[in-house]
Amino acid sequence: MEKRRKSRWPWLLAALALVLILLGLDYWNLLPHRTYTAEHFGIETLQSPLDADGDGIDDYTDLMLGARRDAENHPAYDPGYFAGGYPPEDRGVCTDVVWRAFQNAGYDLKALIDADIAENTGLYPRVQGTPDPNIHFRRVPNLRVFFERYAESLTTDPYEIAEWQPGDIVTFEGSHIGIISDKRNRDGIPYLIHNSGQ
């Protein structure tokens, strides 16, 4: 009987170790989780009446798909300065997710921001008097000013789940930016598509 008890301990310890490993992987979101959509929560997904690039996909969806495409490319985090302004496709920061999403929808966000900075330089905190089209469209504080001027401000409460729509743009205290996904967690809170050096 004594021998049998001893032989169970390695199995029990191995099972306990496996459970602890799985709990740790789940805690740090390293295991795949089921994702949900707005429809799972009875939320209507809004569609833009516009289709700037004429591809048959509304602009809100195009923004979200463009952001997802950029994230799937896994660009290396690189806040560097690039002649012409645009980093290579395999490089970028959080703001690059946004202009690439707009590009996917048929908009030249860089040109729009550059034009507004040229006309309203004093409103943009990162410009410091001299516009530089090679970098200013890639700075979160400048994007925040631009979107505050030309976009509708929505809720910042993540628990107002019906208010969050795919393609929405979110800024965080002027230091980070991303685009809302069409995927949500089990509580209905949408995921953010962004680049933070992941």
Predicted regions: what is each one?
Residues 1-2, 31:
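Intrinsically disordered, low-complexity regions enriched in serine, threonine, proline
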Residues 9-11, 28, 99, 164:
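A residue-identity detector for tryptophan
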Residues 118-197:
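...with weaker cross-activation on analogous glycine-rich loops/strands in unrelated enzymes
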Residues 26-146:
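N-terminal capping segments
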Residues 5-6, 75-80, 172-176:
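Generic structural signal for short, solvent-exposed loop/turn connectors between secondary structure elements
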Residues 2-19, 23-26:
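N-terminal Sec-pathway targeting helices
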